[in-house]
Amino acid sequence: MPNSERHGGKKDGSGGASGTLQPSSGGGSSNSRERHRLVSKHKRHKSKHSKDMGLVTPEAASLGTVIKPLVEYDDISSDSDTFSDDMAFKLDRRENDERRGSDRSDRLHKHRHHQHRRSRDLLKAKQTEKEKSQEVSSKSGSMKDRISGSSKRSNEETDDYGKAQVAKSSSKESRSSKLHKEKTRKERELKSGHKDRSKSHRKRETPKSYKTVDSPKRRSRSPHRKWSDSSKQDDSPSGASYGQDYDLSPSRSHTSSNYDSYKKSPGSTSRRQSVSPPYKEPSAYQSSTRSPSPYSRRQRSVSPYSRRRSSSYERSGSYSGRSPSPYGRRRSSSPFLSKRSLSRSPLPSRKSMKSRSRSPAYSRHSSSHSKKKRSSSRSRHSSISPVRLPLNSSLGAELSRKKKERAAAAAAAKMDGKESKGSPVFLPRKENSSVEAKDSGLESKKLPRSVKLEKSAPDTELVNVTHLNTEVKNSSDTGKVKLDENSEKHLVKDLKAQGTRDSKPIALKEEIVTPKETETSEKETPPPLPTIASPPPPLPTTTPPPQTPPLPPLPPIPALPQQPPLPPSQPAFSQVPASSTSTLPPSTHSKTSAVSSQANSQPPVQVSVKTQVSVTAAIPHLKTSTLPPLPLPPLLPGDDDMDSPKETLPSKPVKKEKEQRTRHLLTDLPLPPELPGGDLSPPDSPEPKAITPPQQPYKKRPKICCPRYGERRQTESDWGKRCVDKFDIIGIIGEGTYGQVYKAKDKDTGELVALKKVRLDNEKEGFPITAIREIKILRQLIHRSVVNMKEIVTDKQDALDFKKDKGAFYLVFEYMDHDLMGLLESGLVHFSEDHIKSFMKQLMEGLEYCHKKNFLHRDIKCSNILLNNSGQIKLADFGLARLYNSEESRPYTNKVITLWYRPPELLLGEERYTPAIDVWSCGCILGELFTKKPIFQANLELAQLELISRLCGSPCPAVWPDVIKLPYFNTMKPKKQYRRRLREEFSFIPSAALDLLDHMLTLDPSKRCTAEQTLQSDFLKDVELSKMAPPDLPHWQDCHELWSKKRRRQRQSGVVVEEPPPSKTSRKETTSGTSTEPVKNSSPAPPQPAPGKVESGAGDAIGLADITQQLNQSELAVLLNLLQSQTDLSIPQMAQLLNIHSNPEMQQQLEALNQSISALTEATSQQQDSETMAPEESLKEAPSAPVILPSAEQTTLEASSTPADMQNILAVLLSQLMKTQEPAGSLEENNSDKNSGPQGPRRTPTMPQEEAAACPPHILPPEKRPPEPPGPPPPPPPPPLVEGDLSSAPQELNPAVTAALLQLLSQPEAEPPGHLPHEHQALRPMEYSTRPRPNRTYGNTDGPETGFSAIDTDERNSGPALTESLVQTLVKNRTFSGSLSHLGESSSYQGTGSVQFPGDQDLRFARVPLALHPVVGQPFLKAEGSSNSVVHAETKLQNYGELGPGTTGASSSGAGLHWGGPTQSSAYGKLYRGPTRVPPRGGRGRGVPY
């Protein structure tokens, strides 16, 4: 097809009708020789091919007429690469190889060749000799020199030959000159490029028997082959349009068959046919024979991948092989480039003949062709040049012979011929060129190939076409039909296989050729038309139906018997050409007869081309159907890569890329239809594929392409439909090991989800192993207490985007409103014993499930335990989890589990651990639920082990026999031996819970209870989750670890700002800066607002106005709720709300505070401004100095100064309230001036302040104050003097301190009433300013709480420093950040909780009263909210120092004193609820490095 069309085009371009006829005889003889040579090659390589060719010969002859281009072997071989049709490809390749071999052998001995073939052989021999001499000269010279030399020689020869041809006929001359040019060009290419090409071909073909045979001969052959190919390529536009012929591969196959028929039809029709059918059968379809080379080449070429592969491969490999530089050679020598350069440059002498003879269109074509090919298919360019090289090699062989024969007369005639070609051929070329230009416009990339092929091919092709037409006429029409059918079948297969790929290029090629060939064909067409006349109607079918029908016949085609089927198939194909012709009538009808065969191959292509523009989808469909053939490219790499890359590279790579892209689009649309087509194609390929390799490629290609498409489709459904953009991201709620966690809403269902981001950009080794583990494990864990992973989505629409730009995956989890750490640190909630039972029951059920599934969680901590508002617990974050084999004792890393929850065996270096490690972590959480803060808070492994030893006893062989076997036992064991005092420290918790805690925190892992045993414990066995009332959780605020961290940082930053800046303004600024954020965290604020409200409404209004501006809606709502509910409350009422009333002393103090507040409200508000400055400064100083500020006075001062800054006032009020409480409690605890000393140190210690910041929400004071009633029992200060002092101090301080505090509080409250809510929210900022560091309790910020918070925070970081500054005063409990943090934390937790959760506040206060009774009374009176802080501060000091809280703090922090102190235990027990809150979170918030 390509040849005939190209011939037609070339003929038209070369010399109109006469050109066509003359070239037919001359070119036909050379073509027949080439075919002869190819046939001999083919026979030499395969008698099968000869037989098959013989069978196909009739069809080939007829198709040769119609599909001459396909017959061109070099064309076909390059086209075969281009074509998806492996048969054609194989045939081309075989023919090329055989031609190469046969070029030599043909020279030596012409196998059965018709006169044409013999004459061609003679021409080829002459040309070969010339080429050999040229090659020798070019070999002597550089490859470029060879190319240029051969081009010049070729140009000269072409000129001579062109002149001779001009004498013969302008068309023949133009064609022959073009052929000669192409020959010389290809000779040059062959010489320089052919060596490389033969090398690359050998490399490629080495896998092929043909290649192996040819490779040695190739250099000698390669010129011949290139000449032969050249002539054949010239004969068939397919050579010129190899890149296109890739797509035309079927056409080309047919063309090669037809062309062989052409060449053979007169005398070597059988041979040519034998070549063609075997070509079809073995090369095109018998991918096995040539399956790797022709079939896989073609099909690979057909397949976008093979094409691309072959194209790029050929560029660098095959093309560079053929031409020194695939691009350079192509550009200079490539049919398009060389034509362009020839027509445009001195080389034009030859090229001008071709391009001129071809016509401006050709030059345009070559320019547009080469441009497009260069631009669109640089890869194809190389492919094209290889294509052309094949044309040049095959046509070049013929042309070189012709040139040599004509050389004598051609020298003079060439110049004339050039001129004549320039004019006559140029005009037809112009006409064709206009059509071609349009075609090239349609597919310039395809056109460049077809143009090149046509340019070289038209001359030879016209001759060949005419010759073939004569031969075809001479030969049986049946043969023609068979050849046509075979060609068409090949074309169909190629079109089907390549159709998608090649059909576009082919269509362009053929369309391009069509104009020229149409003219030529018009002259030539009459004979072939009758053959195709009947078939034309099916043309429409040709694109899809013939592809499918030819495929079935194609398998027969491989077998000689299939020739009969081929005629039937030929009708189909003929119909395709006919319809193609009909479609192409303007250009094609004239071509029809010559193009008939071409029409069979090319018309389908043309139809494809025409259809391609519109039926591009169909072509992609063809591609899709071709995709099954695409598997051939895998063959391509071996044998086919060399040939197919050459042929396929130029046009196929670019086209392929485009087609692949189109495929993506088309694939999506046509895939369903094309998959059937592909299925049909694969059948065709399978039949020709009688050779398994092609089928495998087919299957592979489909698997690669279709599956890829399918995968992409699945990807689109999996990725595209479920991309991250399907979720509305609400905000960030956490930070994981490999990314962030976002709260999002599913746009489709409206469901809330958590998106855990898995970032890949920073991953050196791809997908994070932790994420892979988590995904793998979570898919196996389905339990109500294990978080459910719903799906995985990405931030890309499909996988290809992922390759280009590393994106991220998102694990989609069900959304949980809170995590345990956020809730505990928030101070917004207090968990009752029933709640703790429920939580532990669910937690242990989930853990037992994991352990039964043999998974170790290895990272259980409060932040990985999620809760929703209904009280449901889920275990999350399985990034460190792993499968555990109990039967196999193997080492695992001991660097797992967050330090605070890490069991002693891991700290001592155990690597063969068991699920008991998770039970220890759950035991730590159980203690934390009661104490409200982590019970072991250290920042170093050694310190962590020390804390554990102080509470649980030192690890020793007596209690833990195997401990001496642990690696770090000797290096890590505590210097001091401790006895186990866990029961003493936690005596305040229920006995059932204490028993469970004792068992869970057993040092020896072998004696530690299992998850299953915990569920059978008295504490959990009777728990019925369904009957448990859900805890009162803050629905208005999602409490997550990240949120609590931010609050802590804000408070810390505020405190830090306060400390450094001497002026309160900076503190205020800092406070205000932080206030907005703290406001969000101001959940604790509600309790404080209540006190403020109680104090005065005017101050409330003022404070509210300022603070409101800085608060969120949620914060404001909380404050408003608190204010509204508590605005009218009196201090006693506030005390009740805060549970402070439980203590009679507290009530009395609150009443006194109420009175003093009312009296001092006005004066205090004024004084506070002035006082605040001094207090703040003093506070700043105090933080730096362990000395305690005159908490009451300073607090008052700070509060008073705050009026200037409402936020500062709020912060000051909270601080004052805290300090007020602290002074009473902290002074007592400090065993120093209760008024100034205790408060100062607590708050003064920079470390405590920091920790306070860490524990920012020390709003517990109000809540903890209520627990103070339990305080009286604690007052016996069994712990250090602190408790005694606290108990006495509260009473002692209560009068003086209370008066001062009441005054201070009353002043702040006058303003704070409105500010208290703000205080709560703004207070945090204020607290930051007022107190060096925000404590969990806002009150803490001002005084002890701040110190406690700081201590808690610093407990891990700078426990000693805090201990030194505060501990001296505070006692060992305080020394431990735990004690301070407990109090501070309690304050923050309770304070926060008191406002929203009175019950929580009550519990906390129940605990607080111990230390706070007297002192707390004042704080509570002063400001319920502020009082909270104060009470809590005292509670911290007293509770931690005197009571269990202090003990808890100490035990938690690891300070030994209070842990051991029995009084502390009792105090703790009394203050249990309050202190629990205080110690747990405060310490954690501050000390926890979450």
Curated annotation (Swiss-Prot):
Positions annotated to bind ATP: 733-741, 756, 814-819, 1040
Disulfide bond annotation, renumbered to this chain: none
Record Gene3D superfamilies: Phosphorylase Kinase, domain 1 (3.30.200.20), Transferase(Phosphotransferase) domain 1 (1.10.510.10)
Main localisation: nucleus
Cell location: Nucleus; Nucleus speckle
Active site, renumbered: D859
Annotated crosslink Glycyl lysine isopeptide (Lys-Gly) (interchain with G-Cter in SUMO2) location: K263, K509, K655
Recorded family membership: Belongs to the protein kinase superfamily. CMGC Ser/Thr protein kinase family. CDC2/CDKX subfamily.
Protein name, per record: Cyclin-dependent kinase 12
Encoding gene per record: CDK12
